[in-house]
A protein has these predicted regions:
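Binuclear metal-dependent hydrolase catalytic cores
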Residues: 1-123, 128, 133-135, 197-223
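Cap/insert and terminal regions of metallo-dependent hydrolase folds
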Residues: 128-218
Length: 223
C-alpha cells in the first residue's frame, strides 16, 4: 500500500486485478485492496481475475480475517472472476488471454494483453518460459520475464532449484521468440544499486532488442 501511495495511485483507480498464482507475495496484497474497497463508499467494485485456487484462497482469508460487516459487502463489491486456460476477456480498452504456464510447483497463469494501438504485452508469470506456450509469446512487442539472478551467479543463488531462470536464460528465450522488448523482474535484491547495469549487460549478450530492468516505482511506457 505504501508503494501505491508513493506511485500516486489511489485505491479507487484500481478496478481490475489479475493474480497469477497463490503464493503469499502475490495474494496477500490483494487482501488489503479488498478491505479498502469494502471500506470505501459504494458503488465502487473491484474485479479480480484468476484460477479457482487463488479465488478460493482469497475468499477463505477474507472470511477469517475481515470484520463481518465487511464480509457482508463482498458479494456486491468484490467480483471474483474465475478464468481457465485459454480464456479471453476484456478489461477497459485491453483484450487479454490467460494461459496455464504448466508449472510443476503451483498452478499458475500467465497472460497476453493486446493494448490500444496494436501493442502486445506478454507476462510469463513467476517461472521460466515453457516452450508449450510459445504461441502466446512469439513476436510479442513486450515480454515480461522473471530473472532471479545473473547466470554468472547461478551457483550462489541456485535459480533452477527454485524454478527460476537467469538474466541470460530470459534473454535467450526473448531472442528465440523474436520479441521487441524484454522486461526482467523478480530478481534477487542483493545488488540493487548495480542490478540494472549488471542484468542489462548479461541479457544483452544474447538479446539485441530493448532490455528493461525496472527499479521500484519506475514507469515504462509500452509503445
Amino acid at each position: 500500500m505504501i508503494q501505491l501511495e508513493r506511485a500516486g495511485i489511489e485505491r479507487g483507480e484500481i478496478a481490475d486485478l489479475f493474480i497469477t498464482h497463490a503464493h503469499t507475495d502475490h495474494v496477500l496484497g490483494a487482501i488489503w485492496l479488498i478491505r479498502m474497497t469494502l471500506q470505501r463508499p459504494a458503488p465502487e467494485v473491484l474485479r479480480i481475475y484468476s484460477h479457482k485456487r487463488v479465488l478460493d484462497m482469497l475468499t477463505a482469508v477474507c472470511e477469517m480475517m475481515l470484520p463481518q460487516k465487511l464480509i457482508q459487502r463482498m458479494p456486491d463489491r468484490i467480483q471474483l472472476i474465475e478464468v481457465h486456460d485459454g480464456d479471453r476477456f476484456e478489461v477497459g480498452d485491453m483484450r487479454l488471454q490467460c494461459y496455464d504456464i504448466h508449472s510443476t510447483k503451483e498452478q499458475q497463469y500467465g497472460f497476453t494483453a493486446d493494448l490500444p494501438g496494436g501493442v502486445r504485452l506478454v507476462c510469463l508469470g513467476d517461472e521460466p518460459f515453457n516452450a508449450a506456450n510459445a504461441s502466446y509469446a512469439e513476436g510479442a512487442d513486450w515480454l515480461m520475464s522473471e530473472a532471479f539472478c545473473l547466470y554468472a551467479d547461478r551457483e550462489r543463488y541456485k535459480p533452477y532449484e527454485k524454478h527460476h531462470s537467469t538474466a541470460l536464460d530470459a534473454a535467450r528465450d526473448a531472442a528465440n521468440l523474436h520479441v521487441r522488448n524484454l522486461i526482467l523482474y523478480h530478481t534477487e535484491d542483493d545488488h540493487l544499486a548495480q542490478r540494472k547495469a549488471l542484468y542489462t549487460a548479461e541479457a544483452a549478450t544474447a538479446f539485441c532488442g530493448s532490455i528493461r530492468v525496472p527499479d521500484d516505482l519506475e514507469v515504462i511506457e509500452l509503445d
